[in-house]
Amino acid sequence: EVKLVESGGGLVQPGGSLRLSCATSGFTFSDFYMEWVRQSPGKRLEWIAASRNKANDYTTEYSASVKGRFIVSRDTSQSILYLQMNALRAEDTAIYYCARYYGSSYWYFDVWGAGTTVTVSS
């Protein structure tokens, strides 16, 4: 069974930092692109970060809203995806999800975690 389990959310003051984790199991972690997506209150899902697969050297990509503040990384030995979030702002308040990105004839997020909640407030 393929599983993604996020953790690390919480309440943090503006300007603070958090590190989210996404523990994965049931598939070959290195073969897949892995993504972070968030949903702020009352807003649509927003893609924020990608970690490409081993074949693409685990290169990363970020949305403009988090670039320079957030860092996505992997622990390939433990099959964990991370999101280091720095210089947090009130607008970063959201539920954060990790998702597996799957490609065949087209690309889509085929497995999601349940999410972890981040609240940025003083």
Swiss-Prot record:
- SMART domains from the entry? IG (SM00409), IGv (SM00406)
PROSITE patterns the record matches: IG_LIKE
Alphabetical GO CC annotations of the entry are: extracellular region; immunoglobulin complex
- Indicate whether tRNA processing appears among the record's keywords: no
InterPro entries xrefs: Ig-like_dom, Ig-like_dom_sf, Ig-like_fold, Ig_sub, Ig_V-set, IgHV
| Segments forming a coiled coil | none
**Keywords carried by this UniProt record:** Adaptive immunity, Immunity, Immunoglobulin
Annotated Ig-like domain residues: 1-114
Query: GO BP, one example?
Result: immunoglobulin mediated immune response
Please provide, alphabetically and separated by semicolons, the GO molecular function terms listed in this UniProt record: antigen binding
| Top-level taxonomic group | Eukaryota
Whether Protein transport counts among this entry's keywords is no
Q: What else is known?
A: This chain was isolated from a myeloma protein that binds phosphorylcholine.
Q: What is this protein called?
A: Ig heavy chain V region M511
